[in-house]
């Protein structure tokens, strides 16, 4: 009888751990990765964004992390949402992006600092004769605002599936 009880408890614990692990894996994937690039004149910038998995009512995702380079200068970090990059006050950032052919970022845009101590705010300007993307670049002694072309695309990640016995099935692409 004790052996049967032990077996039942160990199976129950295994099932509980399996479901807890499945929930952890599901939450671990609750971010979206994007490839992004922009260029204009002598500016070339590219890298990756990490965003929330959830979209707001306008279809925007919140950017939570950025990596990449601007003209070979490594990006150090994402500038905080709700703040302005130094030299571009009072224009605050919202760090939002969406899947769209035009105006993927807002008029507030996203901002970052570089390893050499410069700051960048890339945004969509709807006040131009022809609406488009712009980059504000600031250093300790300079300020520039130039038009750029911008594109970001979510990275398609393989989906891991298992059959009822827990055996991993071949990956599918979303």
Stretches found by the model and what they are:
Residues 16-18, 28:
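Cleavable N-terminal signal peptides
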Residues 13-14, 22, 39:
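Residues at the start of alpha-helices and the adjacent loop-to-helix junctions
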Residues 2-15:
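Bacterial N-terminal signal peptides that target proteins for export
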Residues 31-172:
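Mature extracellular "passenger" or substrate-interacting domains of secreted, surface-exposed proteins
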């Amino acid at each position: 009888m004790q052996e049967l009880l032990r077996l039942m408890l160990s199976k129950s614990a295994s099932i509980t751990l399996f479901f807890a692990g499945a929930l952890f894996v599901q939450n671990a994937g609750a971010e979206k990765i994007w490839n992004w690039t922009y260029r204009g004149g002598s500016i070339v910038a590219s890298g990756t964004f990490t965003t929330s998995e959830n979209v707001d009512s306008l279809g925007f995702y919140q950017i939570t992390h950025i990596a990449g380079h601007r003209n070979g200068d490594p990006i150090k970090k994402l500038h905080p949402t709700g703040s302005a990059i130094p030299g571009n006050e009072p224009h605050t950032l919202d760090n939002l992006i969406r899947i769209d052919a035009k105006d993927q970022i807002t008029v507030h845009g996203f901002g970052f600092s570089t390893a050499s101590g410069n700051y960048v705010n890339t945004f969509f300007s709807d006040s131009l004769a022809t609406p488009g993307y712009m980059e504000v670049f600031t250093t300790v002694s300079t300020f520039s605002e130039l038009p750029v072309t911008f594109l970001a695309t979510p990275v398609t990640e393989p989906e891991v599936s298992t059959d009822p016995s827990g055996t991993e099935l071949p990956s599918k692409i979303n």
